A protein has these predicted regions:
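Non-transmembrane, aqueous-exposed alpha-helical and coiled segments at domain scale
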Residues: 2-307
Length: 307
């Protein structure tokens, strides 16, 4: 049974969860509203995406750029959670934690779902090689391995955060999947194979000991918080038109970005969501490849870009 901090175990009316999401192609300013709402929450959950999404939060006049960490990490009274729907690149996450702690932010409250999947070196290499192979038909990915990581999750061959806690299981899974990845690298892209020992050395010896204190039952924490009447903010990355199913496919991200993804990515039921807040901005922008029907060019377009 998860024990809650005293401030969560209060006898008040139950406060269901709130979802904050973008309604366009991203960069709508979700971080600003998240910052305002977070102050009335006890838990803030990032429920999908990876380090391909960034957002900026301003707290007490200080600006913080975040990639994987939810904005709740900036508040000492909030438990920040990385949900099972996120794909985690350990080095990026640890570097982000280190940068924040160097600025006086305490990240010890962070909880990472053991069911979240890991972004592996072969994901990043295959992402870049596939884009190059597609040439003029490329999708414009960030080449950070997000798509291949989600593909392995769907194929049921992905490694998860909790695998870092058991070296034997991690190595067994790694050797199985790496055999296939190396065959693709060699026979399709004429690349040298990756070393299982080298990958395991980084992930088990370098990353696992530092991430272990954060790994826990994220779903249990969220449910216990809601049951105790605590507020939970579900923080989405990217936006609606980049959703894998409902966006401008194939020029989309590799996860579901709409409100429904908060249920699967954080482990809550739809009836536990009280509010879904969609953020839009006055004029739409889009980064990367893909259709943009309302694009403004010329002098006005240049002026909007500069602003």
């Amino acid at each position: 049974m998860i024990s809650l901090p005293p401030e969560l175990a209060r006898k008040e009316a139950r406060v269901p969860a709130t979802v904050v999401m973008g309604t366009q192609w991203g960069d709508e300013g979700k971080g600003k509203l998240t910052d305002l709402l977070a102050k009335e929450m006890q838990v803030v959950v990032r429920y999908q995406g990876g380090h391909n999404a960034g957002h900026t939060v301003v707290v007490d006049g200080e600006s913080f750029a975040l990639q994987l960490l939810p904005s709740g990490v900036l508040y000492p009274f909030i438990t920040p959670v990385i949900g099972n729907g996120v794909v985690v690149e350990p080095k990026v996450l640890l570097d982000e934690i280190q940068r924040l702690e160097a600025r006086g932010v305490d990240c010890a409250r962070l909880v990472i779902s053991g069911s979240a999947h890991l972004v592996m070196p072969y994901h990043q290499e295959l992402d870049a090689l596939t884009e190059r192979y597609l040439g003029k038909n490329k999708l414009g990915t960030t080449k950070r391995g997000i798509g291949p990581a989600y593909a392995d999750k769907a194929a049921r061959v992905g490694l998860r955060v909790q695998d870092l806690l058991d070296a034997k299981i991690f190595r067994q899974k790694l050797e199985v999947v790496l055999k296939e990845k190396n065959a693709i690298l060699a026979k399709v892209y004429n690349r040298l194979p990756l070393s299982a020992d080298e990958i395991a050395g980084h992930y088990l010896d370098e990353y696992a000991p530092r991430l272990a204190p954060y790994i826990g039952d994220a779903v249990g924490l969220v449910q216990a918080t809601l049951a105790a009447g605590g507020g939970v903010l579900l923080e989405g990355a990217q936006a609606t038109f980049l959703d894998l199913d409902h966006g401008t496919y194939p020029f989309v991200t590799s996860s579901n970005t709409v409100a429904g993804a908060a249920c699967t990515g954080a482990g809550i039921g739809p009836r536990q969501i009280e509010r879904v807040i969609g953020i839009a901005k006055a004029y739409v922008t889009r980064v990367g490849a893909g259709p943009f029907p309302t694009e403004v060019s010329g002098e006005l377009g240049d002026a909007l870009v500069e602003r």
